[in-house]
C-alpha cells in the first residue's frame, strides 16, 4: 500500500530479489511508479543474488533499467571468492518518500509468503517505521 502511494522516492535494499512471482509483481509496481516520476532505486547483495536458486540475471536487470528502476548489485562476487565473501549486505530496508520505512528479516521471494517445504513453517517479520527514525534508515 505504501509503495503504491509513493510520490517522490522508493529506495529498497535487500539481500536478494528472487526471480519469482512476488518480485515480478513488485517490479511491475515499481515500474509504474517510475513512469509516474517517482525515483525508484534498489540495491541487492551479489552473494545473496547468486546464492538463491532463481537469481536476477543481466537480461532481468536490463529490463528493469529500461523500465526506470535504478537497480545495482552490491559487491559482485569475483574470483578469488574468499577476498570479499564475508563483506555482505544482509539488510532489508525500504524507505518511501523519506517518511515511511520498513525493515526486518524478509527478502523479496515467494517463500516468505507461502513457506518452503524443506524448512517447514516459519515466520519472518518486517516492521513499519514512521517519524524521525526513518532518517536513520534512508
Q: Residue locations for each model-derived region?
A:
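HKD-type phospholipase D/PLD-like phosphodiesterase module
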Residues: 1-9, 13-138
Amino acid at each position: 500500500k505504501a509503495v503504491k502511494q509513493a510520490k517522490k522516492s522508493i529506495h529498497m535494499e535487500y539481500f536478494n530479489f528472487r526471480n519469482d512471482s512476488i518480485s515480478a509483481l513488485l517490479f511491475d509496481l515499481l515500474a509504474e511508479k517510475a513512469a509516474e516520476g517517482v525515483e525508484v532505486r534498489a540495491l541487492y547483495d551479489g552473494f545473496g543474488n547468486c546464492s538463491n536458486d532463481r537469481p536476477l540475471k543481466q537480461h532481468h536487470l536490463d529490463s528493469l533499467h529500461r523500465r526506470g528502476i535504478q537497480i545495482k548489485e552490491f559487491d559482485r562476487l569475483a574470483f578469488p571468492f574468499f577476498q570479499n565473501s564475508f563483506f555482505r549486505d544482509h539488510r532489508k530496508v525500504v524507505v518511501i518518500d523519506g517518511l515511511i520505512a520498513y525493515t526486518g528479516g524478509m527478502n523479496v521471494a515467494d517463500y516468505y509468503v507461502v513457506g518452503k517445504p524443506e524448512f517447514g513453517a516459519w515466520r519472518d517479520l518486517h516492521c513499519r517505521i514512521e517519524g524521525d527514525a526513518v532518517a536513520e534508515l534512508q
